[in-house]
Amino acid sequence: MSSLSVYHVSSPEIPNKVLTHFEDIASTLAEQGVRFDRWQAAAKIQPGASQEEVIGAYKEQIDKLMTERGYITVDVISLNSDHPQKAELRAKFLEEHRHGEDEVRFFVAGRGLFTLHIDDYVYAVLCEKNDLISVPAGTKHWFDMGENPHFVAIRLFNNPEGWVANFTGEDIAGRFPRLED
């Protein structure tokens, strides 16, 4: 089940609130300019699936988002616990960073913890299959796939180069809860 835990930056051990109802999660994130939506991930995709398989299975949804928001680049991150670079990828995504453009993720399998650092608050969004999250350009965030990743997410960008992170150098991500396997 998707959830949202909201923390003040000064108290990473205790959330101010925890939400599990879709409407509550979506409205709380919308107040911060973040889109959280439910889409139907109809095709059966397993972590480890190729980018071509995933894009082919979700072409209609991808085309809709690209047309709706003007995204020009799409890629897929598909990881399972056997991936040889899982530790390196986890470490990279766990560093707080921002992008010069919106970042959109549509989870078509598994789950991941997408954490946003906005002003004095941290919003930890547990995203699962069917969840779509769109983070505005410039929003500081990090992503945890857990020690044993199991997820497939379609990522859309306004940048032709795709995923380009500007790391903040802050260690805040290490102070907040991570995704437990």
Swiss-Prot record:
Keyword hit for Metal-binding: yes
GO biological process assignments: L-methionine salvage from methylthioadenosine; L-methionine salvage from S-adenosylmethionine
EC identifiers of the protein: 1.13.11.54, 1.13.11.53
Record-annotated site: May play a role in transmitting local conformational changes: 102
Residues bound to Fe(2+): 97, 99, 103, 141
Sites annotated May play a role in metal incorporation in vivo: 96
Associated pathway: Amino-acid biosynthesis; L-methionine biosynthesis via salvage pathway; L-methionine from S-methyl-5-thio-alpha-D-ribose 1-phosphate: step 5/6
Protein name: Acireductone dioxygenase
Species the sequence originates in: Pseudomonas fluorescens (strain Pf0-1)
